[in-house]
Structures are given as C-alpha cells and as structure tokens.
C-alpha cells in the first residue's frame, strides 16, 4: 500500500546552500521532517547549480519520511543572470534596466519547458519575454 501524504511544503532555496536556519528549518520542523537529512540531500543534488535559486516541492508522509522534487530556477532569476543585473526595475514601464538577446530568451525558455504550461518553445519564449518586460528588461533581436 502507498504511503499517505501528510503535507506538501514548497520552498525556494539557493542551490547547494540549504541549512537548518530559516526558512528551511521552521517549515520542515513543523512537518516533522529530519531537517539535516533534507539539507544534505538537497545540497548534494543541487551543488552543480550554484548561484541559482531552486524551487523545491517536499512531500512529507505520515511516517515522517519525505521525498522532494527540484524544479527549474524561476525565469526572473535566469533573466537577471543573463542580463548581469542584481534586480529588476522598480518602474518597468518607464525605466529599462538591461537588454537581453532573443537567442538567450530561447535558451531560457528551453530550460524552463518542463515546468511551464506551454506546448511549444515559441509559447514558452512569450512567457519568458513577458517576465522580462515586467522586470524592465528589453528584448533585442
């Protein structure tokens, strides 16, 4: 018989830098998960993606065991890395902060495809371009 799920915990943690301090500790402590076990496993799985923020969905079962799935980094994080900026524009309609080439947007869209609700790379590109626009990043051909 399958284990019963008691809780789903969603977090965004820097790759390879999970530790028992907030936000990881309190979120997993409430669910009764072995925090150090999760941290070691997460850090081992994400050590090659250093510098990126990785969304993770942790499934906690009634016997306090857990499994987790790592997702692709948010489009905003990938766009900031591609543009070489620290943060997006506070006024994206008035003040543009950077430019990104369309081929870089395609690269990001292809990376994000498994997590996006898109049927083709072109529609995924439109989603990534929308994120860029809302951050004050201009897309160049």
Swiss-Prot record:
<keyword id="KW-0699">rRNA-binding</keyword>
<dbReference type="InterPro" id="IPR036796">
    <property type="entry name" value="Ribosomal_uL11_N_sf"/>
</dbReference>
<dbReference type="GO" id="GO:0022625">
    <property type="term" value="C:cytosolic large ribosomal subunit"/>
</dbReference>
<dbReference type="InterPro" id="IPR036769">
    <property type="entry name" value="Ribosomal_uL11_C_sf"/>
</dbReference>
<protein>
    <recommendedName>
        <fullName>Large ribosomal subunit protein uL11</fullName>
    </recommendedName>
</protein>
<dbReference type="InterPro" id="IPR020783">
    <property type="entry name" value="Ribosomal_uL11_C"/>
</dbReference>
<comment type="similarity">
    <text>Belongs to the universal ribosomal protein uL11 family.</text>
</comment>
<comment type="subunit">
    <text>Part of the ribosomal stalk of the 50S ribosomal subunit. Interacts with L10 and the large rRNA to form the base of the stalk. L10 forms an elongated spine to which L12 dimers bind in a sequential fashion forming a multimeric L10(L12)X complex.</text>
</comment>
<keyword id="KW-0694">RNA-binding</keyword>
<dbReference type="GO" id="GO:0070180">
    <property type="term" value="F:large ribosomal subunit rRNA binding"/>
</dbReference>
<dbReference type="Pfam" id="PF00298">
    <property type="entry name" value="Ribosomal_L11"/>
</dbReference>
<keyword id="KW-0687">Ribonucleoprotein</keyword>
<dbReference type="GO" id="GO:0006412">
    <property type="term" value="P:translation"/>
</dbReference>
<dbReference type="InterPro" id="IPR000911">
    <property type="entry name" value="Ribosomal_uL11"/>
</dbReference>
<dbReference type="InterPro" id="IPR006519">
    <property type="entry name" value="Ribosomal_uL11_bac-typ"/>
</dbReference>
<dbReference type="InterPro" id="IPR020784">
    <property type="entry name" value="Ribosomal_uL11_N"/>
</dbReference>
<dbReference type="Pfam" id="PF03946">
    <property type="entry name" value="Ribosomal_L11_N"/>
</dbReference>
<comment type="function">
    <text>Forms part of the ribosomal stalk which helps the ribosome interact with GTP-bound translation factors.</text>
</comment>
<keyword id="KW-0488">Methylation</keyword>
<dbReference type="GO" id="GO:0003735">
    <property type="term" value="F:structural constituent of ribosome"/>
</dbReference>
<keyword id="KW-0689">Ribosomal protein</keyword>
